[in-house]
């Protein structure tokens, strides 16, 4: 178990990257995608119906994102969030500007009771 600013987290495998601050003055931690070879990701079509996970395999640490799709990208982390608290996910402006990617709901909220592998 590791700790980051009083928030404990667990890695689901050894290759998962720790949350890091990009600079000493960064207000938040950066998270990285965890896309092991031969894994799959959940893909949602434009109408938010779930598509078979087997249809979108990870190849060479990459996953294809088609127009009007939403994809859950795993971090490989499990956060030990205290009851009554949450982890907030914010999109990086550079990710949207340079790659056209952002969070579907603009801010992601992970409640203390949420665990998904």
Each model region followed by its residue ranges:
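DUTPase catalytic domain/fold
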Residues: 1-117
């Amino acid at each position: 178990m590791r700790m980051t600013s009083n928030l404990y987290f667990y890695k689901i495998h050894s290759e998962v990257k720790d949350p890091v601050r990009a600079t000493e003055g960064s207000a938040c931690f950066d998270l990285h995608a965890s896309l092991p070879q031969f894994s799959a990701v959940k893909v949602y079509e434009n109408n938010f119906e779930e598509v078979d996970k087997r249809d979108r395999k990870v190849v060479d640490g990459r996953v294809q994102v088609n127009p009007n799709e939403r994809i859950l990208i795993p971090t490989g982390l499990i956060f030990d969030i205290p009851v009554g608290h949450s982890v907030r996910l914010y999109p990086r402006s550079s990710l949207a500007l340079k790659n056209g990617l952002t969070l579907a709901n603009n801010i992601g909220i992970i409640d203390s009771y949420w665990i998904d592998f």
